[in-house]
Amino acid sequence: MKVLLLVQKEQRAILDRLYEGIAEHCDCDTRWLSSAEQRNLRGYFRREVDVTQYDRIVFFLRFKQEIRQAGFIRTIPNLVILEHDAYQNYIPCKYTGKFSAHYRRLPWARVISSGFVVSQRLREEGFEAVFVPKGYDQALLQPQTRERDIELAFVGSTNSVAYSGRKALLDELAQVEPLVVTRTKSGEEYCATLNRIRFFVSADVGMGEYMIKNFEAMACGCVLLAFDQGEAENQALGFKDKVNVVFYKDIPQLQEKLAELRANPQLAADIARNGQELAVSQFSFARIGQRIVEVLQPPLRPRAPLSLLETLRLKLGV
């Protein structure tokens, strides 16, 4: 299968291993698009892409730019959209309902969502949505033999509106527990910091799915204290409470379970080990890339014929 994979050149997360994981399992032409190229997809395709050469054209671009160009995107054959932010469709933020509105203009496109329940909800709306979770960079994030001298911590951003629930929970927890909240550079510093943390607090409040940090912390051997996203999401990922992760729904429950783990270091060590084994076997970008290619394979829904205006604009390149 010949795949054109269009990704963002300027992206905070380092996802090169994910793209390599996809390329391992298909004939993949990966292109890194600048912000300017993403803003003018019609021009980019006119200059750089022969759509007849590809069995699948996969977008992993900024949603903000996609929604402004749905008229052109409708004309692209064999379209698949890889989307890690579709949970924002269902939470109070500037993109509430916007993903549904966008996909209604592209009803034949396959959407690969990183949330199990999100993909279910999209399917209920009539879209062809499939689930492949987020993962972690197996080359960058590995366990080290350093001392875990930070007992309880969160590493990452709390700034955006989508993270307002995260910030509120972490602020509340910091009032009653010795929580460290910090940020690091990507890469070695991030890996080293995760390897110093015994209990990693994941606070994906109100998001309905697990963000990438959960898998990164598990891979580095932290005990993951995860805000519970519900039975369906947990089952889809193989997450089991006090077996490979520790779930909580509020601060009192988190404190109760934390006290149990402090009193039983062997239980904590077992959970960390089981979580790490699950992450390594199921959530490395090598494995996630393979899963993405698997869901690219089935035939796509037939695309509606182009209108006369769409055909004319394609021919004229305007």
Label each region the model flagged.
Residues 1-54, 59-74, 78-237, 317:
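Nucleotide-sugar donor-binding catalytic core of glycosyltransferases
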Residues 243-251, 260-265:
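Conserved acidic donor-binding segment of nucleotide-sugar-dependent glycosyltransferases
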